[in-house]
Amino acid sequence: MAQSTYVPDRVGVVGLGLMGGSFAKAEHEGGREVYAWNRTHATVELAEIETIDGELTDDVIPTCELIILAGYPQVSIDWLQRMAGLISPGAIVIDAVGVKRVICEKCFAIAEGHDWTFVGCHPMAGTQYSGFAHSRANMFHGAPMVVVPPKMDDFDRASVLERLKHLLEPCGFGSFTLATAAFHDEQIAYTSQLAHVVSNAYVKSPAAQSHKGFSAGSYKDLTRVARLNAPMWRELFLDNADNLSREIGTLIGNLQQYKDAIDARDGQRLEALLAEGDRLKKEAERR
């Protein structure tokens, strides 16, 4: 391996939206030097006031031990492709994208020609809001971090993961879970993407416009993520279209059973369906 050029613990963040801004603020509060790049330069200037030490320029990239790709999937891939030759040997590059197959396949391939390591990551945290203004330093406190490591021997993998945990220590993640990109995308289609589709579709009922005075916790819970960043979620949904389409189909089939029982006024069948859902929820919580 060539001589490293990075400054220990220095962090570069690519994309200062909700996730990137939260990474930058957490690392800054943890005493780390943080540099950032964003497509909208005004956001970088805003972050320079109290969050970052400067812009992530071509001269700064080789000095970062950790680089976090926190933009949309294709933006992150394109940035890494352009800047791969500037990254220090021995540095670690991670992403924060909500799908893993597409980004890991391309970023692992980019990394193969260099002496730095790419590790796929997905912080399991967020809000229904987007943008740097809504980012916060405690966004990841106690949250799980899903990690998709590259193919390497057990010793090298353990070494990279220990370094990664150290570099992300200011973020306060509650756990680090190893997964393959394929398994991650299967699970996330159900636990996150389907929830956003359902919430977004649910508020399209005409009744939503007159809900005030008739809604409480269940309405609030189900509609929270109906408010979303449409361009970002479009890209995430289409990058995981096979898994998400399957989950939507499963849900449609399940809903049809409830509708059929209600249309038939079949109380016995309806009660059985409700009891089954209650039982499966309890089983899932015990795992």
Predicted regions and their residues:
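NAD(P)+-binding Rossmann beta1-loop-alpha1 motif at the extreme N-terminus of oxidoreductases
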Residues: 2-62
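Phosphate-coordination loops involved in phosphoryl transfer and adenosine-cofactor binding
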Residues: 7-10, 90, 142
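N-terminal Rossmann-like NAD(P) cofactor-binding module of classical short-chain dehydrogenase/reductase
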Residues: 67-68, 94
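Glycine-rich, N-terminal phosphate-binding loop of Rossmann-like dinucleotide-binding domains
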Residues: 70-72, 97, 149
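Internal alpha-helical scaffold of NAD(P)-dependent oxidoreductase catalytic cores
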Residues: 137-224
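Interdomain hinge/lid region at the active-site interface
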Residues: 210-280
